[in-house]
Every structure is written in structure tokens, then in C-alpha cells.
């Protein structure tokens, strides 16, 4: 078994703000020092610089592309101060989020990052995408659009238009929310995705959401239940792997 860790940086959740706090520089340095002190099973150390920051709940109760840009640049610069072989991925956007008080549409957010710092995307090595079959995490895999399994393609097209560069991508969240309607189709959905979408040569990793989320609000996505028994999601995914 070969494990390639993809570690997402996180902070503390503030019940008062009902959001994850924004890290300061000292906290970032401590996080990177901690990670540098670990024994990694790979030479390259893949880290994701926080999560879905186009949600206020993920960023101190506010949506702030400029502040996140500064943090992303600082993490990238600091991670490269030593020969630690860090590979930087940005926070994935929630591609289904609208423009509003507590969220910002993904490409609006990314455009504001680019406007603030036209070099911002040069501080990342690999793109990071959350490409879900929306709406409701339960659409068919053949759907096309930024809110579909093909969302990463819209990410990469945006980057190409701004930088002229072709990025590789890791899809670090994707998959279906199982329900009574799609339960019997999950294996065929995963098979289609593997054969026709995730086979894109620019995709270098796909990590479905999630291994174990039961009990809790993510139980219907989970590959293992609360008793550590495989779920229908597990068997559907395994069956799809056998088809390719």
C-alpha cells in the first residue's frame, strides 16, 4: 500500500463567530514547522492552504480575497525557505456558492485575487478543486457546467486565461450524496467519472469525499459506517475500479 498524503492546513473553529479563524503568521510558521518535523512517506509534501475560503464560515466570518491572497503568498514563501520539498495547493473554491453576504461566487473570488495580485497564482504548484455533481451533490455524471464533476475544467480554463499556463489539478473533494434515487446507480456513476472525466490527463489525484463521516451530517457520503463496516458507497467505488 502506497500512501501519498495531501495535508490541508486548518485553524480553530470559533463558536462565537461560527467560523474558522484566520491564521496569523506565527500560527502558520508553527504549522509548517510541525509538518516539517514529521516523517513523510513521500519526498514531496503536498499541502493545501486552507479550505473553501469563498465562504465566510471558512475565513473568520468574512469573505476577503485580498487577505487570503496575502496568506497564500506567505505560506508559499515560507514553505520554500528551506529545502523541504513542499508542493503548494490553494484552498479549493466552493463552485456552487453564489454571490451573497456570506459567500462569493468562485470565479468572482478568484478574479478579485488576481486583481489584487496578478502574480498570485504563481505561488501555487498544483491546482486544487472541489468538483461535485451539483445541485444537491446528486446530479448525473454526464452533466456539464462549473457545478458538475467537470468543475475542475472551468478552474483550469480560468487559470489559463489569466496566466497562460497549464496547471495540473488534484480533485480533493468529489462524489455523491447517496439517496433513495441514486443508490442503485452509484457504481455506474463512478465508472463513468473514472472513464470519461477523471481520466483527463491534467488530473493527477482524485480523493472522493469521504472515507468515514458516520455518524454525522456526512454519513450519506461515507465509505464506512459508524460501525466501521463498508457502505454502498464503498462497494460502488470498488466495483467501478474493477471496471477500468
Predicted regions and their residues:
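Substrate-engagement module of ASCE P-loop NTPases
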Residues: 198
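Histidine-bearing beta->alpha loop at or near hydrolase active sites
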Residues: 51, 176, 213
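Eukaryote-biased recognition of C-terminal alpha-helical segments
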Residues: 205, 209-213
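Aromatic- and kink-enriched transmembrane "portal" helix at the membrane-lumen/periplasm boundary
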Residues: 53-58
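Noncatalytic carbohydrate-binding groove/subsite architecture in carbohydrate-active enzymes
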Residues: 3-17, 21-37, 45, 64-191, ...
Amino acid at each position: 500500500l502506497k500512501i501519498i498524503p495531501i495535508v490541508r492546513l486548518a485553524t480553530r473553529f470559533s463558536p462565537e463567530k461560527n467560523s474558522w479563524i484566520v491564521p496569523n503568521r506565527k500560527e502558520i510558521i508553527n504549522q509548517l514547522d510541525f509538518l516539517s518535523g514529521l516523517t513523510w512517506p513521500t519526498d514531496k509534501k503536498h499541502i493545501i492552504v486552507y479550505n473553501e475560503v469563498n465562504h465566510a464560515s471558512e475565513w473568520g466570518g468574512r469573505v476577503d480575497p485580498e487577505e487570503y491572497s496575502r496568506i497564500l503568498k506567505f505560506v508559499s514563501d515560507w514553505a520554500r525557505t528551506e529545502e523541504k520539498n513542499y508542493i503548494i495547493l490553494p484552498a479549493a473554491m466552493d463552485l456552487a456558492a453564489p454571490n451573497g453576504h456570506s459567500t462569493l461566487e468562485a470565479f468572482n473570488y478568484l478574479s478579485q485575487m488576481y486583481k489584487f495580485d496578478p502574480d498570485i497564482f504563481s505561488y501555487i504548484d498544483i491546482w486544487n478543486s472541489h468538483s461535485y455533481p451539483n445541485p444537491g451533490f446528486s446530479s448525473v455524471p454526464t452533466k456539464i457546467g462549473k457545478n458538475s464533476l467537470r468543475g475542475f475544467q472551468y478552474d483550469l480554463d480560468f487559470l489559463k486565461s489569466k496566466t497562460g499556463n497549464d496547471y495540473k489539478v488534484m480533485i480533493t473533494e468529489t462524489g455523491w450524496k447517496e439517496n433513495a434515487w441514486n443508490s442503485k446507480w452509484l457504481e455506474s456513476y463512478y465508472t463513468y467519472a473514472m472513464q470519461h472525466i477523471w481520466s483527463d490527463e491534467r488530473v493527477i489525484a482524485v480523493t472522493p469525499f469521504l472515507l468515514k463521516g458516520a455518524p454525522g451530517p456526512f454519513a450519506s457520503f461515507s465509505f464506512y459506517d459508524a460501525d466501521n463496516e463498508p457502505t454502498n458507497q464503498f462497494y460502488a467505488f470498488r466495483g467501478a475500479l474493477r471496471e477500468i
